[in-house]
Swiss-Prot record:
The keyword Acetylation is assigned to this record: no
Name of the protein in its database record: Protein translocase subunit SecA
Job description of the protein: Part of the Sec protein translocase complex. Interacts with the SecYEG preprotein conducting channel. Has a central role in coupling the hydrolysis of ATP to the transfer of proteins into and across the cell membrane, serving as an ATP-driven molecular motor driving the stepwise translocation of polypeptide chains across the membrane.
Residues that, per the record, bind Zn(2+): 816, 818, 827-828
Subunit details: Monomer and homodimer. Part of the essential Sec protein translocation apparatus which comprises SecA, SecYEG and auxiliary proteins SecDF-YajC and YidC.
Organism: Lawsonia intracellularis (strain PHE/MN1-00)
One Pfam match: P-loop_SecA
Keywords from the named record: ATP-binding, Cell membrane, Cytoplasm, Membrane, Metal-binding, Nucleotide-binding, Protein transport, Translocase, Translocation, Transport, Zinc
Subcellular location: Cell membrane; Cytoplasm
EC numbers on record: 7.4.2.8
Cofactors required: Zn(2+)
GO BP of this protein: intracellular protein transmembrane transport; protein import; protein targeting; protein transport by the Sec complex
Length: 831
C-alpha cells in the first residue's frame, strides 16, 4: 500500500527514468536545423569527424550521442522517408545504455535501433544486430543498409549456407545483421579452427537483440550444439519401441502431463524384462535399457506429432513451442530424438557426440554491452535482471492505443469452443472485418482450417508446414474479408497494414484459440492489432479441456465454474475466471523460470571450463613460439610423475615411474630399456633431445607442426571431456536422494574431471610428439586430417613439406582396451 502512494506522488521507476532523458531529447531536437543544413555529401564527412574525435579521445561516446542521433534522424528522413519520433529517440538512448526497450508492436523498433547502431559503430569494433530468422536479417540489412551507406558505414548480413570467406566479410563490416543461431554457431566453429586466418568473428563488442524475449528466454532451454557421429548402434531404439507399443496405460505405466514425465510401474518393468529376456532391468548393468525405455515412453505419451514436431522427408523435425517455427538441424538430446524416429517409423539416426556447445545465455553474456528490444518484455523483467543484468524500460507509444481487449469466453469442451470460434469467424467475415486466428499448434490450425473449408470460408494458413510466403500472408492479413490462421510464428517483424475501409469496420480482430502457458506470448498475439493508433480488437476462446486449464487451473477455478453453472454450448465470460487463468499462467512462468535458472547454474560450470579451454586454444593458435607451452607442459607432467618419489623411494614406485616414462614419453627412442631410473632433469634433457631431432626434420614448418599437435590433442581430449560431463549431468539428479545438493556435486565432480582433462591433454601431447614420423614430400606440406568435418585446412606456401604419421595410442585416463572397464592407468597401464 505504501509503495502505491510513493508511485502516485513520485511516479514509477520507469516514469522517473523517462523524465531524466528529457534534457538529452531537447539537445537532439535543438540540433535539427543544423543537420538539415548539411548537404548529402557532407553527412558522411560529419560522421567521420565524430569518429575521429572519439578515437583521438577528444570526446566520449556519450558526449557525441545528441549530434549523432540528430544526424541519423536527418539522414533517415532523406534516404528512407522516415523521421524518428521522440519515443524512438528515447528507445535509442536506452539501447545505447545497455537496456531492453519494450516498445509496442508497430512503433518502429527496426528504425529505432539504427540510432545506437550508428553511434556504437564509431568505435570500429563491429556492432551485431540479432534477429529471429534469416528473412528478417536480410530484410533489415537491405532496408537499413541504405541509411548506413549514406552515412559512410558498411553493412554485412549472415544467412545460413554462407562460406567462411563471405562470413568473414560480413563480420568485417561496421554493422552485421544475422540470426542468433548464426552468431552462436560461428563462435563455436571459430573455436574448432586451426589457423588465425580461418577465424570469421572479430570479437563481441555490442549486440542489439530484436525480439529479445524470444531469443534470451524462449530459446534459453535449447543449447547450440555442434556434434559428430557416434559408433553406437540404433537397433535398441526400434527394439524398445516395439515393446512400448504393447504396454498398457495405467497398468504398466502412469503419465504425469504436468511434469512431462512417464513412470514405469512394477508390472511394466516385468513386461519389458520378459520381452528382452533379462532378469532385472534395474541392475546397474542395464542402465542403458532403463534410459531407452523411459525415452520411448516419453516419445509416445508426452510428445505429440504436429504439436512438438512434424515428420518431413523421412525425418523428425522439431517445432519451436514458442514461435511455431520448424527447427531443422536441431535434435532433441539424450536419445529422445531417436525414440521419436522409432515411434514414427522413419530412419533412426545414430546418436551424435557433442564436439562443442554453448547456451544463448552464456553466448550473449560475452558481449561487452548487450541491449534488446521487443513488444513484450515487462512480464519477464525479473528474469532479464537476474540472469543478464538487463533492465527493462517501457517506452510510451507514439499514438494512444485504442484496441479493445475483450474478456475471455470459456466453454466446457473443446468441441463447443471450436464450434463457437468458427461461428465468430463467419460473422466477422460476413461484415468484411479481417480476422487473425492465433493457435498454439499446427494440429489446431489445421483443425480450424478443415472446419472453415466445410463452411466454404476462404482463408490462409500459416504454420510450420506452410511458411514459405509467411511475410506476404501476414502483410495481407489486414485487408477486407481476410481470414488468416497462424501459429505463434505469426510473422513477427512484419507489419499488418489495414485496408482502406477496414478502419470503419473496427480494424483487425485477433481471435485466440487457447491461452499459452506464457502471458507474454498471448500479449504478442494481441499486439498484432491496434498498431500505431489503429483500431482493433481481441478475444480468447477457451475450454475446460485446454491443457493450461486442465493441468494448471486450480481447484478453486473448477469450483467457480460449477457455481456459475454451465450449459452445453453456453460460454462463461467472467472477470474472476480471467484472473484465475492469469494466475495459472504466472505459476507456469515461475516454474519455467526456475528450470531455465537451474540449467544456467549447470551451464555456468561448463562455461568456466569452456572459457579456459577456448582461451588456451586462442593462445596456442596465436603463439609465435609454441615451444614455450610444450616446456610448461613438460615441467607439469614430469612433476606429476616424480611427485611421489619426493616422499618415498622403493622399487615398486621406481618401477611405476619407469613405466610411465617409457609409456608416455617413449624414452626407448633415446635410451636403452633397463631398470635405471633417470632423474627428473635427465628425463627432461632426453625428451628435449627428441624435439631437437624433430625440429631439424621439420625445418621452417616446426612451429606450425607444434601448434597443430597441441590443438589436435586439446580438441580430442575436450571432445571426450564433453561426453564425460554429459554422463555426469545425466546421473547427477539422483544425488538428491542421498540428501546431497546435485548442483554442488556437479561442480565438485566437474572440477575433478576438468583436472583430468588438463592432465590428458599434457599426456596426449607427449605421446604424439614422441611417436611422430615425418616423411619428406615433394608437393604437400605436412598434411593432417581435421578432427571433424567442420575444420578446413588453410592454404600454405612453404618449400619444406612433410607427411605426419601417428600411431594409435591409449591415454592413461582412457578405458583400458582389455575390456575390464577400468581406466588404463589402473589396469594394464600399471605394468
Amino acid at each position: 500500500m505504501f509503495s502505491f502512494f510513493i508511485r502516485k506522488i513520485f511516479g514509477s521507476k520507469n516514469d522517473r527514468y523517462l523524465k531524466s532523458l528529457s534534457p538529452i531529447l531537447d539537445q537532439i531536437n535543438a540540433l535539427e536545423s543544423t543537420m538539415k543544413a548539411l548537404s548529402d555529401k557532407e553527412i558522411p564527412v560529419q560522421l567521420a569527424t565524430f569518429k575521429q574525435q572519439l578515437q583521438e579521445g577528444k570526446r566520449t561516446i556519450d558526449e557525441l550521442l545528441p549530434e549523432v542521433f540528430a544526424l541519423v534522424r536527418e539522414t533517415s528522413f532523406r534516404v528512407l522517408g522516415m523521421r524518428h519520433f521522440d519515443v524512438q529517440l528515447i528507445g535509442g538512448i536506452s539501447l545505447h545504455r545497455g537496456k531492453i526497450a519494450e516498445m509496442k508492436t508497430g512503433e518502429g523498433k527496426t528504425l529505432m535501433a539504427t540510432l545506437p547502431v550508428v553511434l556504437n559503430a564509431l568505435e570500429g569494433k563491429g556492432v551485431h544486430v540479432v534477429t529471429v530468422n534469416d528473412y528478417l536479417a536480410q530484410r533489415d540489412a537491405e532496408w537499413m543498409g541504405a541509411l548506413y551507406s549514406a552515412l559512410g558505414l558498411t553493412t554485412g548480413v549472415l544467412t545460413s549456407g554462407l562460406s567462411d570467406d563471405a562470413r568473414k566479410e560480413a563480420y568485417a563490416a561496421d554493422i552485421t545483421y544475422g540470426t542468433n543461431n548464426e552468431f552462436g554457431f560461428d563462435f563455436l566453429r571459430d573455436n574448432m579452427k586451426f589457423y588465425p586466418n580461418q577465424l570469421v568473428q572479430r570479437g563481441h563488442f555490442f549486440a542489439i537483440i530484436d525480439e529479445v524475449d524470444s531469443i534470451l528466454i524462449d530459446e534459453a532451454r535449447t543449447p547450440l550444439i555442434i556434434s559428430g557421429g557416434s559408433e553406437q548402434s540404433t537397433t535398441m531404439y526400434t527394439q524398445i519401441d516395439k515393446i512400448i507399443r504393447n504396454l498398457k496405460p495405467q497398468q504398466d505405466f502412469s503419465i504425469d502431463e504436468k511434469g512431462k514425465v512417464v513412470i514405469l510401474s512394477d508390472e511394466g518393468a516385468v513386461q519389458v524384462e520378459k520381452a528382452l529376456g533379462i532378469d532385472n532391468m534395474y541392475d546397474p548393468s542395464n542402465i542403458a535399457i532403463q534410459h531407452h525405455v523411459l525415452q520411448a515412453l516419453k516419445a509416445h505419451y508426452i510428445f505429440r506429432r504436429d504439436v512438438d514436431y512434424i515428420v518431413k522427408d523421412d525425418q523428425v523435425v522439431i517445432v519451436d513451442e514458442f514461435t511455431g517455427r520448424l527447427m531443422p538441424g536441431r535434435r532433441f538430446s539424450d536419445g529422445l530424438h531417436q525414440a521419436l524416429e522409432a515411434k514414427e517409423m522413419v530412419t533412426v539416426a545414430a546418436e551424435n557426440q557433442t564436439l562443442a556447445s554453448i547456451t544463448f545465455q552464456n553466448y550473449f553474456r560475452m558481449y561487452n554491452k548487450l541491449a534488446g528490444m521487443t513488444g513484450t518484455a515487462d512480464t519477464e523483467a525479473v528474469e532479464f535482471a537476474q540472469i543478464y543484468g538487463l533492465e527493462v524500460v517501457v517506452i510510451p507509444s507514439n499514438k494512444p492505443m485504442i484496441r479493445k481487449d475483450h474478456s475471455d469466453v470459456i466453454y466446457r469442451t473443446r468441441k463447443e469452443k471450436f464450434d463457437a470460434i468458427v461461428k465468430a469467424i463467419i460473422e466477422l467475415h460476413k461484415k468484411g472485418q479481417p480476422v487473425l486466428v492465433g493457435t498454439i499448434s499446427i494440429e489446431t490450425s489445421e483443425l480450424i482450417s478443415s472446419m472453415l473449408r466445410k463452411k466454404n470460408i476462404s482463408h490462409n494458413v500459416l504454420n510450420a508446414k506452410h511458411h514459405a510466403q509467411e511475410a506476404e500472408i501476414i502483410a495481407q492479413a489486414g485487408q477486407v474479408g481476410k481470414v488468416t490462421i497462424a501459429t505463434n510464428m505469426a510473422g513477427r517483424g512484419t507489419d499488418i497494414v489495414l485496408g482502406d475501409s477496414v478502419v470503419e469496420l473496427g480494424g483487425l480482430h485477433i481471435l485466440g484459440t487457447e491461452r499459452h502457458e506464457s502471458r507474454r506470448i498471448d500479449n504478442q498475439l494481441r499486439g498484432r492489432a491496434g498498431r500505431q493508433g489503429d483500431p482493433g480488437s481481441s478475444r480468447f476462446y477457451l475450454s475446460l479441456e485446454d491443457d493450461l486449464m486442465r493441468l494448471f487451473g486450480s481447484d478453486k477455478l473448477s469450483g467457480l465454474m460449477q457455481r456459475l453453472g454451465m450449459e452445453e454450448g453456453e460460454p462463461i465470460e467472467n472477470i474472476m475466471v480471467s484472473r484465475a487463468i492469469e494466475s495459472a499462467q504466472k505459476r507456469v512462468e515461475g516454474h519455467h523460470f526456475e528450470i531455465r535458472k537451474s540449467l544456467l547454474d549447470y551451464d555456468n560450470v561448463m562455461n568456466q571450463q569452456r572459457t579456459v579451454i577456448y582461451t588456451l586454444r586462442h593462445n596456442i593458435m596465436n603463439d609465435p613460439e609454441p615451444m614455450d607451452i610444450i616446456l610448461e607442459y613438460l615441467d607439469e607432467l614430469l612433476s606429476d610423475i616424480y611427485i611421489e618419489l619426493e616422499d618415498n623411494d622403493n622399487n615398486e614406485l621406481n618401477k611405476s615411474i619407469h613405466t610411465q616414462l617409457y609409456d608416455i614419453m617413449n624414452l626407448s627412442q633415446v635410451m636403452s630399456i633397463d631398470n635405471t631410473l633417470p632423474t627428473k632433469e635427465q628425463a627432461k634433457t632426453l625428451i628435449l633431445s627428441m624435439f631437437e631431432k624433430l625440429k631439424s626434420k621439420a625445418g621452417e614448418a616446426y612451429n606450425d607442426l607444434l601448434r597443430y599437435v597441441l590443438l589436435e590433442e586439446l580438441d580430442r581430449c575436450w571432445k571426450d571431456h564433453l561426453r564425460n560431463m554429459d554422463f555426469l549431468r545425466e546421473g547427477i539428479g539422483l544425488r538428491g536422494y542421498g540428501q546431497r545438493d546435485p548442483k554442488l556435486e556437479y561442480k565438485k565432480e566437474g572440477f575433478v574431471l576438468f583436472q583430468e582433462l588438463l592432465a590428458n591433454i599434457r599426456e596426449g601431447v607427449f605421446r604424439t610428439f614422441t611417436r611422430l614420423h615425418l616423411e619428406k614430400k615433394e608437393d604437400n606440406f605436412f598434411q593432417h586430417e581435421p578432427i571433424n568435418d567442420l575444420w578446413y585446412p588453410a592454404s600454405h606456401e612453404k618449400e619444406t613439406k612433410f607427411q605426419v604419421k601417428k600411431t594409435d595410442r591409449v591415454g592413461r585416463n582412457d578405458l583400458c582396451p582389455c575390456g575390464s572397464g577400468k581406466k588404463y592407468k589402473k589396469c594394464c597401464g600399471v605394468h
